[in-house]
Amino acid sequence: MFQNSMKQRMTWEEFHGPNLGYVLELYDQYVKDPESLDADLKEMFDELGAPPGDIRAASQKNEEADFTAGSIQKIASAVKLAEDIRTYGHLNASVNPLRKTQEKQELFPLAEYGLTEQDVKKIPASVICKDAPKEVTNGLEAIQYLRNTYKKSISFEFDHVHIFEERNWLMKKIESGELFTPKSKEKLVEVLRRLTEVESLEQFLHKTFVGQKRFSIEGLDALVPMLDDIIAKSVSAGTTNVNIGMAHRGRLNVLAHVLGKPYEIIFSEFQHAPNKDLVPSEGSTGINYGWTGDVKYHLGANRQIQDEHTKTARIALANNPSHLEFIDPIVEGSTRAAQETRTESGYPVQDVKKSMAILIHGDAAFPGEGIVAETLNLSQLKGYQVGGAIHIIANNMIGFTTESNESRSTKYASDLAKGFEIPIVHVNADDPEACLSAVQLAVEYRMTFNKDFLIDLIGYRRFGHNEMDEPSATQPMLYDAVRKHPTVKNIFAEKLIHKGIVDKETVGKIKDAVQKRLEEAYRKVPAKKEDMTHEIVLPEPVSNGFPDVDTSVDFETLRKINQELVSWPENFNVFDKLKRILERRAKAFEDDRKVDWSLAEAMAFASILKDGTPLRLTGQDSERGTFAHRNLVLHDSKTGDEFIALHHLADTKASFAVHNSPLSEGSVLGFEYGYNVSSPETMVIWEAQFGDFANAAQVYFDQFISAGRAKWGQKSGLVVLLPHGYEGQGPEHSSGRTERFLQLAAENNWTVANLTSAAQYFHILRRQAKMLLREEIRPLIIMTPKSLLRNPNTVSEVQELSNSSFKPVYEMSGLSHQYDKVTRLVLSSGKVSIDISDHFNKMEGEKDWLHIARVEELYPFPAKHIKAIFSKLPNLEEIVWVQEEPQNMGAWNYIEPYLREVAPKDVKVRYIGRRRRSSPAEGDPTVHKKEQERIVSDSLTRKN
C-alpha cells in the first residue's frame, strides 16, 4: 500500500524547505547504503528516484535543516495514512440510509500510524493532499479534510484503477472540492419538485390500484433526478442519443418522468382499459406495443427532448423482459449503432459523443448474473466499445427475500466492476445532492476517458418485491426500520426548509400541483375494459410472408466483384497456402465457372455492399472463419499488416465491419441484436463458433429475437449462422439445436434454413438484405455447413448466382422423370441430404421408385412447394423424413404435422433417423459412422 502511495502520489516537488534538505541527506545515505535506512524510507526512495538538479540546488538555501530520521518516518507514515483514507475511507462512509452514523467505528486514528497531532501539523498540507483548498494549511488539517471528504454520504473506490492519469484525475476532482460545490436554490427546488412527482405517482398508484404489481421505486427515488442530470449534462455536451436499460424496479416512474409517458396511459394499463385515444400515434413519446403485447413494467418508450440551448436528443428506454441484466449488451449494441456512420466503404466511422448508454442494475443481479461480466468485458474491445457506459446499481440491499449476505460473496454489490478497472462511487439515496455529485463525476469521467463508470445508489425497498408481497414475514427487523424511516422527499424538504430555501407552504403547493395533475389524468381513463373476444390478427404483410424479390446478380458484375475480392496491394505478402486458395478463386470465372461456399458468401457480401447496404459480421474467429474458409481479413506474413478486400470495392457507399468476438455467446449476440434493432438498414450477422454453443445465449433467442416483435412491435433482421452437421465430432460439435428454433417458430417470427449449396446461401443472404427495411422483415437463422464447405456437391455454377433465386425446396438433379413410377418421396434437410445424394448416385439397379428433395427453408413451412412435388407423383405411397439428429431433436417433431396435413390421402408419413436420445450425438466416431450409414441406407432401401 505504501509503495502504491509513493508511486502514485509523491514527487520531489512536494518536499519544501527544511523537509527537502533533510530528505536529500537521507537520499544520499540511501545511494551509499540502501539497507541502512528504514524499510519504508528505502521503499519511498525506490519510487522517487534521483532528485532533479534544480531541486538539489534549491536545497542549498536550507542547510539549517536539523530534522531527524524519525521526522522523515513521520512524513512517510502521514502519507500512508492519507493513502489509506483514500483507499478505505468508503468503509467509514454514511452511505446506508437505514444505518445510523454513530454505529460505525472510527477508522484511521493517528496513533495507529505512530503519529500525534503535533507530528502531522509540522508537515505541509501539500505533502498530504496537494489538491486541498487553500484554507487547509497544514498536514493535520489535510488529514481531517481527507477524512471528511471520503466518509460523507458519498464515498469512492478507485484504487483498482491502474492508469495514473485516471487515478490522478479522480483524486483531483474529489479532493479539490469541485464535486461538492453547493447547488443553486433553483436547482434544489427543481430536485424537490422532481422527488415530489416521483413519490406522489407511487403513492397514487398504491392507493388507486390496490394490490397491483408496479415494482415501486420508493427508497431509491433519487434515481429519477440522477437520470435527469445525466441526460441534461450529456445532451449539453453534444450527445444526441441516450439509451437506457433497466429492469422492472422503478420502471414505471422512469417511463413517466424521464421518458414522458403520460400518466393517463400508465393508469389505463392498470385499469386494464386501454384507450386508443390516449396513445399518441405521433409526437414526442412513442409507446411500443406488439401483437400479444407485454406487461406494463416491461414496455419501453422513446422521446425527443430539447434543452434550454435548443439542442435536441432522442431518449430511449429499451423494452425488457424479466430476465434481469440481459438487456445490458442490447443497450450497448444500440448505442454503438447510433455512434457509427455507415455511408462509406471501410469500417464505420464512430463518434462516441453522439450516443451514450445508461445501464441500471439490481444489487442482487449485478454480481449474480454472468451476463453482467460478459457485458463489462466488451467495454474496451474494438468491435464493441461505446466510449463508456454509465452504470447505476439501484441498490435496495435485498433481492426479493434474499439478503446480500446470501446473494453475493463480496462486500459491495459493485465489486465485480473492480476487475474491469471501473471507478465506483457509493452514494446514499437519501442525499439527493450527493447523488447529483456522483452523477457529475460519472459524466465528466466518461467524457474525459471514454470509459465505464459505476454509481452504487444505496437505498432501500419500501414495500415487498412487488406490492402483493409482505416483506415483514422474512425481514421483520429490516421492515420495522423501513416503516419508521421518512421518505427522501420529506427528508429533503425538511433540509431545504431548515436552510431557508423553501417554506412549508411552498412544499405543500408543489405537492398539491402534482396531485392535481395525477387526478386529472386519472379522470381521462375509461372505467372498465371492453370485452375483447377477437383473436389477435397479424399485420397483413407479416402473415403473407416474403414477397418475391430478385436476388440475382449479372455475370459481368460478379466477375468484377471476384477480381476485387482476390486482389491485394503489390507489396502485401499473403500467406503462401492462403495465396494458392485465393488464386484458385480468381479462376472461378475463367475455367469451370464453379463457386464454392466461401466465395459465394464473399460475393454476396460484396454485392450487398455495392447495393448500398452496410454489413456487420461478428463472432468467435469470424474474420478467418472457424473452419479456415472465410479469410476476409488478410495478414501480411512479414509485417502483420491487415488488408480487407471488402473495404476496397469500387463505387461502394456502405461500410463493412468484421470483428472477432470475445469468447462469449450471450453478450455478443445481445449486442448484435441491439445494433440491428437500432440500425435496421444494416445487415447484422452473428456467427457461432459451432452451432452447439448458441444455447449459451438462449435467453436472447427465447425472449428477444423470436418474440420481440410480438411483445413490443420490435422488428429485427438479424442473421444468425450456426455451423451444424453430424460428422463424428461428438455431442458438443454436431448440433445447432434446430429443434429449439423450430419449436419457437410461429407468426412468421423468423426464418429457419438448413442449406446445401453455395447458390442457396448467396440468394438467401441477398434476399435478407433486400427485406431489411420492409414490414415483412424477420430474423434469419441458418444452419451452416462444416465439412460441406469443401464438399464438391455444395459447389454451384456461376449461372445459379446470376440467373436464379432462392429455392425453399430443392429437388435433387439427375433423377428419372418417370414420375408415375415413384412410390417413395425422400425429404431431408442439410448435410444428410448430401449423404443421401452421394449414396443414391453410387446405387446400382432400378431407382425410379425414388424421388428426393431437400427442404432448405424449414420455417416458414414451404407447403406450396412440397404440394407441387406431390402433384407430379400420382402413385406416391409414402413420404419419409430423414434426419441425422435423434427423433426428439432436429426437424421431425416440427415438420411431421405439417407433412401429414399436406400429404395426399392414404400416403404414409414415416421417420428415418436416430432413435430418441438425451444426447445429440455419439462420442465414438466409429459408432457415428455406422449409424450414419444405416440412416442413409434405410432412406434409399425399398421395404419388403
UniProtKB/Swiss-Prot annotation:
EC numbers: 1.2.4.2
Annotated GO MF terms: oxoglutarate dehydrogenase (succinyl-transferring) activity; thiamine pyrophosphate binding
CDD domains reported for this sequence: TPP_E1_OGDC_like
Stretches the record annotates as Disordered: 914-944
Residue ranges with Basic and acidic residues bias: 925-936
GO annotation, biological process: glycolytic process; tricarboxylic acid cycle
Sequence similarity: Belongs to the alpha-ketoglutarate dehydrogenase family.
Alphabetical list of PANTHER family matching this protein: 2-OXOADIPATE DEHYDROGENASE COMPLEX COMPONENT E1, 2-OXOGLUTARATE DEHYDROGENASE
Name the record gives this protein: 2-oxoglutarate dehydrogenase E1 component
